[in-house]
Amino acid sequence: NSGQAISDLIRRKWLDNDFYGSLFNFIYDKNSIKLILGGTLNKYYGDHYGEVIWARNAGNSEIRHRYYDNYGNKEEFNLFAKFQHTFNDKLYAFVDLQNRNINYDAELIGGNNINKSFNFFNPKAGLYYKLNSNNEFYFSFARAHREPTRTDYENGNPFPEKLDDFELGWKHKGKKSIYNINLYFMDYNDQLVLTGERDDVGYYVRANVGESYRAGIEFDGIFFINDYFTIKPNITFSSNKNNDYLTQFDGSLRNFGKTDISFSPNLIFGNTVEYNLNSKTLLFFNTKYVGKQYMSNTNVDSSILASYLVNDLGLNYNFSIPGFFQDSELKLLVNNLLNQKYESYGGHYFYDIDNKTYSGSYFYPMAEINFLLGLDFNF
């Protein structure tokens, strides 16, 4: 305005959303057969607009001038059926079927429009076997599809992802311990993964990566050592790989081969040790370890997010004041007890100069030792 082409300004983006939904189901449960039939219908209508709320050189423009005014609408209709058959007191099987129909209608900044329709068929089937009162085993297969989001379309031309998930597990429940062990293999086609970059409003950018997989073993449990001590560990070992990662690099399309999927550490460990001082006082110690991970699917060294180990110490005290408070609780938590300096997240970006690709990273440092004090009152 008034000949001004460049100005410092502050902009603010808004969403004005309406969501409507309905669902129905029919349940049949008799003898050894249980059947559930149902469906849902959801409609989302969103207005997306941005305003200029301050400008150094405003010219003739008004405050809260809308520099874009778009919409984003999504309709979804799905039908599902859940069938379970109990063969005997030790074995039962289930089959779940779902059909999702999705319609996107949206306008993006720059005048680009989305007019997409998807029809996904998602089956799941499995077996449960109860060996005895303490041990149970299961196996399942599921196929799932996921459509891109509006943000994905704003940052590229994505495809929906497809997943085939295989799981095998063991559940144990005894007097002194409760634990679950789960093996999984997740085979993806066109998985939408984080690239490490952010768009101009801070959303993480995702992109399809062709063929990829996530495979691993998960363990979580509770161990009752005695009347005072309880240990609650959980651990995941995994391998998360892009089979052939292709991207533009140094002016041409490069195949980086098999790489780790971004933000997917191979080892995650957590543990809680609880000690009951008495019937009113609980002392606990939390430990969390996250292994090394990459913030870029290229796995270049500059995108490494280092592993970290952090510990917390807490105390819960239950009390009552007759006539005032019942079953109230005082909570004290010391986060990052050992004052560890670490980063739990960050980002990675690329830029090209004369057909040469350069990269950089940024990190989010976490708080050093800090304290929380809380009171819960029940009247």
State where each predicted segment sits.
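Short loop/turn motifs that connect adjacent beta-strands in outer-membrane beta-barrel proteins
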Residues: 27-34, 90, 134, 176, ...
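C-terminal beta-signal and adjacent terminal beta-strands/loops
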Residues: 231, 239, 289-294, 318-379
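Membrane-embedded beta-barrel scaffold of Gram-negative outer-membrane proteins
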Residues: 130, 136-140, 160-246
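Face-selective signature of the C-terminal outer-membrane beta-barrel domain
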Residues: 1-109, 130, 177-183, 232
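Transmembrane beta-strands of outer-membrane beta-barrel proteins
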Residues: 33-39, 93-95, 123, 137-139, ...
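Gram-negative outer-membrane beta-barrel transporters
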Residues: 89, 185, 207-298, 376-378
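Transmembrane beta-strands of outer-membrane beta-barrel pores
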Residues: 30, 41-47, 97-105, 141-147, ...
